[in-house]
């Protein structure tokens, strides 16, 4: 049985089913409130939800049982007395040692928990980084939205910030270094590109079987790094558009990546929906669209709304749209089926 945690503008939906056999809504939570992200810690089974209440603001909630009450985590806040306010928590990721999790949000913040998500602490080194005044808010805010731990090494971490570029640490977040070399911000004046820090990275993922390899969807470009994020190569040639938001990998194949290209102007699929796949590290791309809408389909898929579970030929892929539809594949993208319709606008999809 596959569980889908679906964060929407009007609450959390938990779906259950099997590829090709249908999915149904098991339960809902935080009805009426925006749920920006939800995940289940694969180590403990604990569920987490990032909820932005119009009354209480952004919080992280957790529960060990969907049938029990959710508890509010402590410490998800910015220092008192400052001019900034916490606006959103966009992502929660399990770390590489027991009890550790990370959460990223707006305005360009990273939180860390060492007690299975019950309490959190702000990463001061990133918050107080001297380049922060040069970071820039984009249409989605100023957000830490991608967090990529290094398998087996809790000291190494890669982050993506929109719009603040790629950041790397090798000492558990005590210090941070930029990882922007090779990324070309075509939307900036040419004379500003070489020194720009405020790069609009849309999503970043690490290949778990070859952790020095990362894939990145940019604001105009799809990139690959083979040196742990220090330098990047554009691999977008062959795609119908180089603009998009999510990127997903097959854990079994470090040469794999999946993207959903959208138009630059209105940021939706251009009439037909296709997931584009590479199995040669971006040298070539192939559209995978059997079972997807191929006519008059203008979908917007946000960066956290495309995810995978499993690996290899039985890799399951799921993506949701702001129009409330979810599509899935049980065979690594070869064929697709409808999972759900008429949900509220979807912000995140995570299978467990």
Where are these regions (language model features)?
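Extracellular glycan-interacting surfaces
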Residues: 1-352
């Amino acid at each position: 049985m596959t569980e889908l945690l679906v964060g929407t503008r009007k609450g959390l939906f938990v779906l259950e089913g099997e590829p090709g056999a249908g999915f149904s809504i098991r339960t809902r939570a935080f009805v009426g409130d925006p749920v920006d992200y939800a995940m289940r810690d694969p180590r403990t089974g604990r569920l987490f939800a990032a909820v932005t209440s119009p009354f209480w603001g952004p919080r992280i909630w957790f529960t060990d049982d969907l049938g029990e009450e959710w508890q509010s985590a402590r410490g998800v806040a910015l220092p008192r007395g400052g001019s900034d306010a916490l606006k959103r928590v966009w992502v929660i990721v399990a770390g590489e040692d027991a009890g550790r999790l990370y959460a990223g949000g707006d305005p360009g913040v990273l939180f860390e928990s060492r007690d299975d998500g019950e309490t959190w602490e702000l990463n001061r080194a990133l918050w107080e980084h001297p380049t922060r005044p040069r970071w820039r808010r984009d249409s989605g805010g100023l957000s830490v939205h991608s967090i990529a731990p290094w398998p087996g090494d809790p000291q190494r971490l890669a982050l993506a910030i929109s719009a603040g570029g790629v950041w790397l640490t090798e000492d558990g977040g005590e210090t941070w270094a930029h990882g922007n070399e090779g990324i070309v911000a075509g939307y900036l004046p040419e004379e500003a590109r070489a020194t720009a820090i405020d790069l609009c990275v849309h999503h970043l993922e690490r290949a778990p079987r070859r952790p020095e390899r990362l894939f990145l969807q940019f604001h105009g470009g799809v990139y690959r790094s083979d040196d742990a994020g220090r330098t990047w190569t554009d691999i977008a040639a062959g795609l119908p558009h180089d603009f998009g938001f999510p990127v997903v990998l097959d854990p079994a194949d470090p040469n794999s990546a999946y993207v959903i290209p959208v138009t630059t102007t209105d940021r939706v699929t251009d009439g037909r929906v296709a997931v584009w796949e590479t199995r040669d590290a971006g040298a070539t791309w192939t559209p995978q669209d059997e079972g997807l809408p191929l006519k008059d389909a203008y979908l917007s898929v946000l960066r956290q709304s495309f995810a995978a579970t499993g690996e290899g030929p039985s890799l399951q892929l799921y993506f949701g749209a702001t129009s409330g539809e979810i599509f899935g594949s049980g065979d690594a993208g070869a064929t697709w089926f409808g999972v759900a319709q008429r949900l509220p606008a979807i912000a995140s999809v995570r299978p467990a």
